Amino acid sequence: MRKITIATRGSKLALWQANHISDLLREEYPGIEVQLLKIKTKGDKILDVPLAKVGGKGLFVKEIEEALLDGRADLAVHSMKDVPTELPEGLEVGIIPPREAETDTLLSVKYDSLKDLPAGAVVGTSSLRRQSQVLALRDDLKIESLRGNLDTRVGKLLNGEFDAIVVATAGLNRLKLSAPKSEILGPPTFLPAVAQGALGIEYRIEDTEIQDILAFLHDEMTARQVKAERGFLTGLDGGCQVPIAAWSQLESDQVKLTGFVADIDGSSPIRMEKTGPAEDAWDIGLALAEEVLAAGAKEILDRVYDKC
């Protein structure tokens, strides 16, 4: 069997994800040779600017996709929440492994929960989605930019730079990171980013051999959830750096999608739901986006883009 090269960012979380897929490949195909190609992306290099102000989509994937296109790598493992809805010609993300937790977690050294934070407490995040939802629940808190890899962000909290931070639960679980105090922030009150907690494997469409090798990793239930949520994001023409959230639930052959858009200060929230056949997940996402836009989301998103 051919030697496989996996393109990945160099952060601890990205390496965990790439090594996780490597381990699964070795278990499935004893003797297979797998190597990692570490690549620095634009998002990794610009750490002194809030993500919303860096601009552009694909901050954490563009350079990795270039390695796929020029043949240096056979596949890439992404956090699906970082992957733009439009991919370069010749590439696809067709393998979606089972999803980890889609929730966020509030970490603190002293405070048990979001409601226990004192007025004026400093909460760290560079996600406009998290900022918007935190302020919708607690408009007396102060949000400050928090950049860096996940272990770096947790370290800043433990060093006393913030009263609390909000990060993805999946990353904490994967790297076994924690803080003295924590609270899960999840649906229905706190909605995740599109495809949060899900991994995606990207490859060249023409490489049918690699697709056959990877097929055992695919989880159709997760794939349908991701399709519904990414359909919603596509319909809103949003990137990962806007206050858009989506959460899909599968019940037998039906998908129930909840979409959320709000201003960055938590005001003017729009939250709507749509249910339909799971096989039509993408179209359900697009349809919900149309309804949310008609309800006022276009004006909200225009304001957000003007501020960025």
UniProtKB/Swiss-Prot annotation:
Its cofactor is dipyrromethane. Keywords: Porphyrin biosynthesis, Transferase. The keyword Transferase applies. GO terms for molecular function: hydroxymethylbilane synthase activity. Pathway: Porphyrin-containing compound metabolism; protoporphyrin-IX biosynthesis; coproporphyrinogen-III from 5-aminolevulinate: step 2/4. Binds 1 dipyrromethane group covalently. The keyword Transferase applies. It catalyses: 4 porphobilinogen + H2O = hydroxymethylbilane + 4 NH4(+). One of its GO terms (cellular component) is cytoplasm. The modification S-(dipyrrolylmethanemethyl)cysteine is found at residue 240. Signal peptide: none annotated. It is an enzyme of class 2 (transferase). Its EC number is 2.5.1.61. One of its GO terms (biological process) is protoporphyrinogen IX biosynthetic process. It holds the Pfam family Porphobil_deam. The porphobilinogen subunits are added to the dipyrromethane group. Tetrapolymerization of the monopyrrole PBG into the hydroxymethylbilane pre-uroporphyrinogen in several discrete steps. NCBIfam families: hemC. HAMAP family: Porphobil_deam. Monomer. Belongs to the HMBS family. This is Porphobilinogen deaminase.
